[in-house]
Amino acid sequence: MQLFTMMTWLILSLTTGCAVSQGFNQAAMSDVLHVDPTSDQDTRTPSHEGSIPSPPFRLGVFFANHDFPNHQSLRKVEWLSADREQLLHGLAPLRDQQILADIFVLMDSTVQAANSDAIRQAGARYGADAVLIVDGAGAIDRYNNRYAWLYPTLVGTYLAPGTESDALVMATGSLWAVRSEWHAPIQIVEGVSKAVGSAVFVDDSAALQSAKKQAIQALSTRIVDQLQLWMQESPPPRSRLQ
């Protein structure tokens, strides 16, 4: 009787806890990242205050961490070693093209994510000419689909693909010179992923990790394309020395 009661509560929670898609609260994600998602990054130009480092230069990549409580509409993005390696690999074409001399991860636990000046100072201590500040936030939309009607059966609870977990990761990249006030427009990208299965086995964290991987790929591609463009549009070295 006790087992039957436990199974009844399990089935009820599975069928009623996430019945309808709620979508993503992108406004909350943008607030955490301090960005305006409606801005058109392609039409914005880098700051003319100071000069962009002369190529090839050393780039330090700083992965920011935020402390906020996880809930359905907002998830903290954890930057793993694999994530850092993926981004560095994605930026490798800039080294092949002699725009960058070196790319490395800037690790400094004393620096706060929102303090760009402190991050630039840390970059200078480690020999960087510019720093790329990477930030991110995630969200999960978990809901039932048409197969959820099978959940009241014991077999259906474990086998019916009645639950979907949509994941969104919004990532930003902000490029700053270390020894001048030059900085580029913040780049905003998104990665999405979906997991489908029984409510017992659908893993929200796996969907979020997959979306993060997509976001990192999009961000590295965006930075490569934009930095190539910014270098072409920057004044020649003779003008920068005047």
Show which residues each predicted segment covers.
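Short secondary-structure boundary motifs at beta->alpha junctions and helix caps
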Residues: 157-170, 176-222
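Surface-exposed short loop/turn segments
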Residues: 113-179
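A generic local secondary-structure boundary/capping motif
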Residues: 48-51, 161-163
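A short, compositionally biased domain-edge/stem linker segment
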Residues: 38-50
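Sec-dependent bacterial lipoprotein signal peptides
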Residues: 1-18
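Short, highly charged C-terminal tails/helix-capping segments
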Residues: 224-242
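Bacterial Sec signal peptide processing site at the extreme N-terminus
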Residues: 16-37
